Regions:
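Receiver (REC) domain active-site loop signature in two-component systems and cognate sites
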Residues: 7
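Sequence-specific DNA-binding recognition helix
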Residues: 119, 165-202
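Active-site beta3 strand of CheY-like receiver
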Residues: 1-2
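C-terminal output helix
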Residues: 40, 58-67
């Protein structure tokens, strides 16, 4: 969203506040444009969660570059999060609705990843929102739909087990430990995600 600070009916500050306070829209990048050169207004804008604050006059190419950089950074952060399941990789603003949402999602998986019965329906119920909203929010914040997020979290845990293990654990045991009922399916998913077989890093095969 690109908005001017000074607008009729609703100014840019109020619009950005409403956007950032609504869970369905809080992830959307917000760029504030203004002819008012004010350190106070700029600080207030960033406190609300505005992503960029540009003073007029400005070069349109600079605006395009700022937008491109924001989107590129978000794609980079999503990729880093996918391979770590670490909330900090997303660089979400502290004390924001987005940070609360994704932290809750990761904490639920941290608590339940070993439970093979912990499925998408239970996850959505525990998140406390509709399936449509949770799925849209997960894709917007992480680039992953719910099911993929849950599977990737389990695979990341499995990789840590392999990396930190002593080599006396087999593939089947790891699969069951992270909530997979089928070791063959686990191996297939692991290979697709990390590019190597889990057994190649173990002392013995499952």
């Amino acid at each position: 969203i690109v908005s001017d600070l000074m607008m009729p009916v609703m100014d840019g500050m109020e619009l950005s506040r409403r956007i950032k306070e609504n869970l369905a829209t809080s992830h959307i990048p917000f760029l504030m444009l203004t002819a008012l050169r004010s350190d106070v207004q700029e600080k207030r804008s960033f406190e609300i969660g505005v992503d960029e604050y540009l003073c007029k006059p400005f070069d349109e190419e600079v605006l395009r570059l700022r937008i491109r950089n924001i989107l590129n950074l978000r794609r980079k952060y999503k990729k880093m999060f996918s391979s770590s399941s670490n909330v900090e990789e997303l660089h979400v603003k502290e004390e924001s609705r987005d940070k609360t949402f994704i932290t809750n999602a990761v904490n639920l998986m941290k608590e339940h990843y070993a439970d093979a019965e912990y499925n998408l329906e239970r996850f959505v119920r525990d998140m406390g929102y509709s399936k449509t909203l949770v799925n849209k929010k997960m894709q917007d914040l992480t680039g992953q739909p719910i099911g993929q997020f849950m599977k990737n979290y389990r695979l990341n845990v499995a990789q840590r087990i392999i990396q930190e293990g002593s080599g006396d654990i087999n593939v089947s045991e790891i699969a069951y430990a992270v909530g997979f009922n089928d070791p063959k399916y686990f191996t297939k998913c692991f290979k697709e995600f990390f590019g190597y077989l889990p057994s190649s890093k173990l002392g013995k095969k499952g």
